[in-house]
A protein has these predicted regions:
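Hydrophobic residues within alpha-helical transmembrane segments
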Residues: 8, 68-71, 96-99
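Hydrophobic core of alpha-helical transmembrane segments in multi-pass integral membrane proteins
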Residues: 11-15, 49-52, 102-113
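A cytosolic-side transmembrane-helix exit/cap motif
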Residues: 29-30, 82-94
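Hydrophobic alpha-helical membrane segments
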Residues: 43, 63-82, 103-106
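Juxtamembrane helix-break-helix junctions at the cytosolic face
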Residues: 48-64
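Alpha-helical membrane-associated segments of multi-pass integral membrane proteins
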Residues: 88-120
Length: 124
């Protein structure tokens, strides 16, 4: 249940980091690497949504998808923080939301790892 909440918060943050939310930089200022980041973000978003859907029926698979999706999202966040995606500076609200998302991603990774370990215990 905690993993589902963390993933839902992450999905909400991803949406807030888009032009549907608080992103104000125009797409015309996006660099080539930024287009790759958009693909990575959508792939991670799809993995998070699939993980939420599968969490209560196939916990092991859901936790693997959550781990992969969370790891994928670190690349666009760090790339944006370094200025690799846009020729304009990061708006303050995006900057703050990305830091919050890093914390949520770390929590998601921890919870997904915990679900994975509990769904497939190692022999003792």
């Amino acid at each position: 249940m905690a993993l589902a909440v963390a993933l839902a918060v992450n999905v909400a943050l991803i949406i807030l980091l888009t032009p549907l939310g608080f992103e104000t930089r125009p797409a015309t200022d996006l660099k080539t690497v930024g287009y790759i980041a958009i693909g990575t973000i959508f792939a991670a978003l799809a993995l998070d949504v699939a993980s939420i859907a599968l969490l209560f029926s196939r916990a092991r698979l859901a936790s693997i998808l959550a781990i992969v999706g969370s790891i994928l999202l670190f690349f666009p966040i760090f790339g944006d923080q370094t200025g690799s995606f846009f020729s304009l500076p990061i708006p303050p609200v995006i900057h703050t939301l990305e830091y919050i998302d890093v914390v949520v991603l770390l929590v998601s990774l921890f919870l997904a790892w915990k679900v994975y370990r509990e769904s497939h215990p190692s022999p003792s």
